Amino acid sequence: MKFLWAALVVTLLAGCQADVEEEVKLGQEPDRWQAKQPWEQALGRFWEYLRWVQTLSNKVKEELLNSQVTEELKLLIEETMKEVKAYKEELEKQVGPIAQETQARLSKELQAAQARLESDMEDVRTRLAQYRSEAQAALGQNTDDLQGRLASHLRKLRKRLLRDAEDLQKRLAVYQAGTHEAAERGVSAIHERLGPLMMEGPLQAIPPSQQLRERAEAWGQKVRGRLESVGSQARDRLDDVRDQMEELKAKVEEQASQVRLQAEAFQTRLKSWFEPLVQDMQRQWASLVEKVQSSLGISPSTKPSKTK
């Protein structure tokens, strides 16, 4: 039980440190995606295309008004996911005598990381499609506000994309290392079992302490994997909430500006309505006073004399 609590504390502390390091990495994005495997090269092409879109040059603005950009991104997403799948299948072919439970866990974590990366890439394409619709609706008007919001969203999506791409890269490395380690462990176990049989005859049983150690290592890996998964999900949810709050703030500010403009327009309209009415009432009152004075024989320009 003490070992469990110690493992949890160490893992949580490591997670906190990883969050700090992650913010530093996101603040210092690399000039280009360092590509080694085919899937990384495909992702690099998506990455470079996104950087070009973020410039929001006149050429980009022109192509954003049609479906060319989103179609290009769709092809790049399909190419990247195809290469990731091919690389994963290549690793699976290299799997040696690995425990079924370990393989299932590693495969599940890898699929989750792959799904997050694909979702990030699709979010970029969806946001650009949304901008195209908004820009076409506001054609002929000032679109600086739309471009500002698009640039802000693309920066956030790019950070999330970088983080999840690095996570997928690490998961693939762990999967590859796990298969190699399992294969080496399987070959070593065969040698340990067959060696004494060939030299001495009887098979030697695996020491109980070794079995306990292997079980403890497997249990530790399982706990660490679950904690990493929970931490990643929590960070994703926090990012989503932060993005939603910023979008809500922008919408509230926009609606407040619209309400203020509508109130000013309504005030101007009310003034235009009531000014003629007030002027007409003043004219009618002056006419009434003049008639009363005329009926009483009082000249409007003559002041009444004082009685002695």
UniProtKB/Swiss-Prot annotation:
Any matching Pfam family: Apolipoprotein
Biological processes annotated in GO: acylglycerol homeostasis; cholesterol efflux; cholesterol metabolic process; lipoprotein metabolic process; melanosome organization; phospholipid efflux
Any one Gene Ontology cellular component term annotated for this protein: extracellular exosome
Signal peptide limits: 1-18
Compartment list: Secreted; Secreted, Extracellular space; Secreted, Extracellular space, Extracellular matrix; Extracellular vesicle
Protein's job: APOE is an apolipoprotein, a protein associating with lipid particles, that mainly functions in lipoprotein-mediated lipid transport between organs via the plasma and interstitial fluids. APOE is a core component of plasma lipoproteins and is involved in their production, conversion and clearance. Apolipoproteins are amphipathic molecules that interact both with lipids of the lipoprotein particle core and the aqueous environment of the plasma.
Name listed for the protein in its UniProt record: Apolipoprotein E
Native species: Pteropus alecto (Black flying fox)
Gene designation: APOE
